[in-house]
Amino acid sequence: MSIYDLNAYEVLQTEDLSDLKSKGTLLKHKKSGARVLLMENDDENKVFTIGFRTPPSDSTGVPHIMEHSVLCGSKEFPVKDPFVELVKGSLNTFLNAMTYPDKTVYPVASCNDKDFQNLMHVYMDAVFYPNIYQHDKTFRQEGWSYKLDDPDGELTISGVVYNEMKGAFSSPEGVLDRVVLNSLFPDNAYSVESGGDPEMIPELTYEQFLDFHRKYYHPSNSYIYLYGDMDMEEKLRWLDEKYLSDFENEPVDSEIHLQKPFTEMKEVVQEYSIASEESDEDNTYLSYNKVIGTTLDEKLYLAFEILDYALLSAPGAPLKKALLDAGVGKDISGSYDNGVYQPIFSVISKNANVEQKEEFIRVIEDTLKDIVKNGINKKALRAGINYHEFRFREADFGNYPRGLMYGLQLFDSWLYDETKPFIHMQAIPTFEFLKEQVETGYFEELIQKYLLDNTHGSIVIIKPERGRTARMDKELADKLQAYKDSLSKEEIDALVKATKELEEYQEEESAPEDLAKIPVLGREDISREIAPIYNKELETSGVKLVHHEVETNGIGYTALLFDLSGIPEEKLPYISILQSVLGIINTKNYEYSELFNEINVHTGGIGTSLELYTDVTKVKEKEFRATFEIKGKALYPKMDVLFSMMREILMESDLGDEKRLKEILAMLKSRLQMSFLSSGHTTAALRSLSYTSPMAKFKDDTDGIGYYEVVKELEENFEEKKAELIANLRQIAQQIFRKDNLIISYTSSADGLAPMEEAFAKIADTLHTEEKEAATPCEIHCVKRNEGFKTSSKVQYVARTGNFIDRGVEYTGALQILKVILSYDYLWQNVRVKGGAYGCMSSFNRIGEGYLVSYRDPNLEKTMEIYEGVVEYLKNFNVDDRDMNKFIIGTISNIDRPMNPAAKGSRSMNLYMNYVSAEMIREERNQILDAQQSDIRALADVLQALLDAHELCVIGSEEKIEEQKEMFLEIKTL
């Protein structure tokens, strides 16, 4: 029997997706009208997604709050948080839900057939039969609610989405993205914020929330996607019999309307908050935005990806260079958003000034006119096409399942025309078309039509306002106080009662019989086998080579690892500057823009990084190895070009180019500032660990706050510091880029080894051979600071860290289970559910470093108190066998992620450099699979050791940090 014999469905379309080694089928469920798309192939990492078109009508965030809420219990799975139960106890390779400006999607992935079916079941039940109709507590917890602990207390607002969006609105980049979208589409769903504006979220009522679900969460408005190696007939039958056949086809008005084009460009000015001590000079964002056709034009969809590369994204691209040369901003970037119905092309200048607006527009338009008149750089176009085609063919999405990313891309057309779901999956003919157009004037015509003649655009200015956060907080507090003052005693008592009831609901544990309904695997479903390690030590041209032999589809993945021992502590930031500079600065034979194009015409790209390794057999010595790594990938016949370009970058870069160095420092400063607002939790944890860990101090000095402080100092005092900077860069390059300082990591199939060895032989003896100073071990000095960093953010990132091995507690595999237990039980319940933070996590590694962190957290003192309570929680840890199994399975899920060829090679090399043997991994896996509750209780000592270290760092709002100033040894503005 085949899917054609299933009477419940009508087959509308089939496609041979040979480039993706898949067969595509589009169906419609006859009774309910549900749209279904299958991608059949031999990928064991199966994906299921159900999505809904959910255009918002206001900025109350109802699509986002709904996305959170439906995963908080359903008809068949009435536990309070089935999502967390699945995270804890499934072998998922992806499990999440996402709200977009016009859709909400619920994807899951797993390699285990039984687990995959369980995930599908819970998600289908969640979206169609959520418990949101039973009571309003989920809405109040995930969305918003008034919080009043006692009649005389302060009235506040809490809610997970509310706090998440307060964090999102604290970032100028977040403000910019939102205002650009809103500015271009005043008459459709893109005019409002689907995630929710914190000022508007409290306008949403419970009844409006339920109405949104009734309207949009119906099979007639659904898009169901199945990908991978599975019995599609069985899945389709199950979907029909279990869910879809319960519904009749209903008309659902969820159409995304096209915005009528503007007759002239619009201008929008919006403020964002900076800390009271920050300068408002060079802190404005300017954005030039144009609407580019629709996402249903597959040629345009890819052509502007290429133009984004050629005009803006590549180092030295003409728009970027023109704006930098004109001094309009210090960090120029491009953005091409083709994930909405009408894609948006943006030119963004960061660290500019408001009065530069006219110059910004003039430089962009004059540069574009010149490009149209004299022609675009053809090599840049070819490089852009090759870059995107290489990525399409390689299909390396890092940690994300391939099928997940294909599914999300399907929505780029399927959502707007249900007859065209596959147009972006068949990209090779489009790439061939674009290659043929390079010399025809096609791309110049696109620039003229869509960027110069097109009046459907906007200029967006995001400018700083000192103390805006404090002012808005005061306005909200005054508004809430006025509201409270207007209430009768009975109404105030009702608020106190509602607050208490929500807290009691959050304290309640789900009934054991309800928890038992969540399907879980047993330990017996898990293999004790570890993933293979692919390390074979060889020698090539007098250099150690570690070969990772796996099937790579004809691509060779190369990394040159240069040892950094002997670089003194005060020069560590300069290593990172060198790493950032190489590849985007002129070389002897290429201007940096041409260098980048040459690389991307012939290869899959070259990048650099700094990595840290430690001998896990000698953790008490606290010794570690730092390496400067240059990595690249290319097809085997292009290995000689790859190595030639690597050598060009390492040996021929012009490290004395003052103008370019100044531009790069400004860009680095801007991007580090951004990362503190988007990834403040990792920044805070690293900084806190650096108080006592030499390895963490190295990392902070090269990638954290310590590094930022040096970059900022160099950028702001460039004229007096430039000679020292250049001398350091040259000296470090000469000291490290040497054949006697090198190990090579190479991932390929057996037949890819010879081309690599031949290519490396041509450059091996051209690395530095000058006599170098005798290297002395780098001594790193750690200082305990316990810092609070004030920012313009409305939320906190709270980190508590320590080293448990220093206090005599050994590492065990059970600590990996503890990460799951804390992150999805103790911390989740207390920091997220009750505290309202968007995220919380923990980590413990083989060298004894541990941390507890919160993310976009409205609290500070309360979170620290929760951290202090973790030891008592562990001492009293007591769950049934089923729950214990769940924690173990969730732990294995984090370990057993499917790996692409590049990941198999890099994992193997990582184990090699850290001296981790197969026996150690096997022992850790057995410790996880054999763990008992007593093993978890014994870990109270680990947490006690961590807390006894008294190391903490907080990045957050001025107000909260000043309120708790006695907590810190130092308070600074970031």
Regions found by a protein language model. Give the residues of each.
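Generic recognition of flexible, low-complexity loop/linker segments
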Residues: F94, L210-R214, S273-S276, L319, ...
